[in-house]
């Protein structure tokens, strides 16, 4: 059913995330921001987007040939049980690092970043909400 598709997208690792310019952030995701909520970092894969705010993760699944159809998932930090980070090793070709976020419903979301600076900015935002 529809729930399965949602879980598949949420559970699929988002790899090689590249920082998005502010102007390129999905308008529908931006419309979800609340007063006092700000964007910590916005990233994209080849097609999809993930926006980390001061309160939650907003994942945008771009669908269709043009990507105009979108499915948006909101993962609030208050539902996070714990998270883990894996930094790149010396000599790793891509310098990839990964953030794994585990939620109260036993699902986890994985995000792969190029470099480590982005990873720590996002991890700090999550820490502020769950500690």
Give, region by region, the residue ranges found by the protein language model:
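Anionic N-terminal interaction surfaces
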Residues: 3-50, 114-116, 120, 131
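Acidic, Ser/Thr- and proline-rich intrinsically disordered linker/docking segments
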Residues: 9-20, 65-131
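Short amphipathic alpha-helical segments, especially helix-boundary/capping motifs
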Residues: 31, 37, 57, 98-101
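Conserved beta-hairpin
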Residues: 43-65
